[in-house]
Amino acid sequence: MGFTEQYDVVVVGAGHAGCEAAMAAARMGLRTALYTLNVDLIAQMSCNPAVGGIAKGHLVREVDALGGIMGEVTDAVGIQFRLLNTSRGPAVWSPRAQCDKQQYRLKMREVLESEPNLKIKQAEVADLIVEDVSDPTHPERMKIARGIKLRDGRTVGALAVVITTGTFLNGLIHCGEEQYPAGRSGEPASVLLGESLKKMGLRGCRLKTGTPPRLDGRSIDWSKFAVQPGDAEPTPFSFRTKKITQKQVPCYIAHTTPETHQLIRENVHRSPMYSGQIQSTGPRYCPSIEDKIVKFPDKETHQIFLEPEGLNTYEVYVNGMSTSLPIDVQLRMVHSIVGLENAEMLRPGYAIEYDSIDPTELQRTLETKKIGSLYLGGQINGTSGYEEAACQGLMAGINAALAVKHEPPLVLDRTEAYTAILIDDLISKGTNEPYRMFTSRAEFRLHLRIDNADRRLTPHGRRVGLIKDEAWHAHLAKQQRMDELKMTLEKTRIRTSELPVELAEKFGNIDGSTVVQLLKRPESDVAAFEQIIRRVQPTFFERGDSEREFVSDIRNELKAVETEIKYAGYLDQQTKAIDRLKRSEQRVIPEWFDYASVSGLSREMCEKMQRVRPQTIGQASRIPGVTPAAVSLINVYIEIQGRKQKATT
């Protein structure tokens, strides 16, 4: 058929997933079009004006390491940076940044428009153009995507289509008793495309999410709240960011009161979630304030955070108070909090229901099983959060481009990336609630740290064409610097007199010990040895005209070296365990294996295994509800019971 326009890759939806997908395909040399309902709202932060957080920060680092753009944009517009979980081990350290909401979308648009292979188009996509085919290599696949049809009748041909529509498919907003179709507040829902996907035979379900009210900062008594400052030395998201230059501002901590809780209890019947108006499932780990009060009735107060939405606005995001209660109740609820007695509400909170596609309909490349050349990424796959969306969009865009170029797909292993864990969980087990990433979902999280995301994934980005020469050479130089520093510290022996007084008192006499030996002690850190490092390897600090421009670079690399030294033994153990796990994917589970004998295996897991009786470890890992930890336990006990069997025969 004839098309109005023709592209290699078409991306539908310009949220966080769509931006990554479109940019990836375009940077890989393909003519790409990004379609959105409103070009002025590209990469709009629909909810929290922040990027990162526990595990989410890991995802952003991985997106950056592969050649994505979320990290660089966040670094350019972040107005408060905090490294979370620093009281725990480095495996779970995670960066988070409060962003200037307006500047974020403007910067993202600037980056997208700088790519010559990418065209941004404003139009409503109404339908997919699908061709019936017979493919002997994929007998289950009888259709292939050939392009899209716009509401105005134009047709756009494409060799691959990526759909990243977020909450827009048949979106329905709820605020008290009021409900109306919308993709998010003030924007229309994508009804025609939603119905089109249903007709294609793709299984789906309705999911729900919500957002809190926004307040006018000029009407808030800031003196009543505890100040939550950012880090004095911000940790960037991008490995290519040398220094954070944006002005930094604090957030504030407030608390709900008994009056708040009583007000919610008296009006909970007016909440769509409790009146029966909303039937779909919301995010378990981001509950509404109604949910918190109902499910934790004994809790006297709940913490909330007042977060600025930007440097050029007074709008304040009330983190922790997501709600779909009626507007009059929301206003009274806000006024019941100390310091917010006179606060003016700029926007009310609301809940939104939307269509998602069952992610078990997808292959590991995020291409649909039933329709070839059709890829899905982001909330349409059942996830929640900007970061989860971005990593999926990036992978969908990469694999769509690779397919068009007839090159092998990029499929990451769950032992090398949180991105892979997210995708593997979704396609293997599906989800009936918005999926959120946690570090606890990883079997080998000490290997999946934020500091080594580039070491793990940048070679993949280079292979597919997203890491250009300058960035690649910088990456290689960094790895060489760090390797050389580790070797130098292994050879450098020092005297007690060279140590800072406090450390010398803790260590006692350490004459003749190497720096590596001392760094392995829990009470030491690399900062104490900076002067020694400057003496034995001054080139480590030589980064150009001004060392000050590379402060975060140097600090992060030193910390990464310290982590690899301090946890070397554990890392070696996990490397061996990873090798064993990869080999065991195909390991047969003997018929005689006794699940009840596995210490630490919950009754629920045991019952699932006894009922299904999987034949291999790989099959067991894909049973819905079976955790990676349970699979690891079974894997270990197969070895133990196998040795016992041999000993008795």
UniProtKB/Swiss-Prot annotation:
FAD binds at G13, A14, G15, H16, A17, G18, V125, S190, Q379. GO terms for molecular function: flavin adenine dinucleotide binding. SMART domains: GIDA_assoc_3. Pfam families: GIDA, GIDA_C_1st, SAM_GIDA_C. GO terms for cellular component: cytosol. It is found in: Cytoplasm. Gene3D superfamilies: FAD/NAD(P)-binding domain (3.50.50.60), GidA associated domain, C-terminal subdomain (1.10.150.570), tRNA uridine 5-carboxymethylaminomethyl modification enzyme MnmG/GidA (1.10.10.1800). GO terms for biological process: tRNA methylation; tRNA wobble uridine modification. NAD(+) binds at residues 282-296. PROSITE patterns: GIDA_1. Keywords: Cytoplasm, FAD, Flavoprotein, NAD, tRNA processing. InterPro entries: FAD/NAD-bd_sf, GIDA_C_N, MnmG, MnmG-rel, MnmG-rel_CS, MnmG_C, MnmG_C_subdom, MnmG_C_subdom_sf. Its cofactor is FAD. Its main location: cytoplasm. Belongs to the MnmG family. PANTHER family: GLUCOSE INHIBITED DIVISION PROTEIN A, PROTEIN MTO1 HOMOLOG, MITOCHONDRIAL. Homodimer. Heterotetramer of two MnmE and two MnmG subunits. NAD-binding protein involved in the addition of a carboxymethylaminomethyl (cmnm) group at the wobble position (U34) of certain tRNAs, forming tRNA-cmnm(5)s(2)U34. HAMAP family: MnmG_GidA (MF_00129). This is tRNA uridine 5-carboxymethylaminomethyl modification enzyme MnmG.
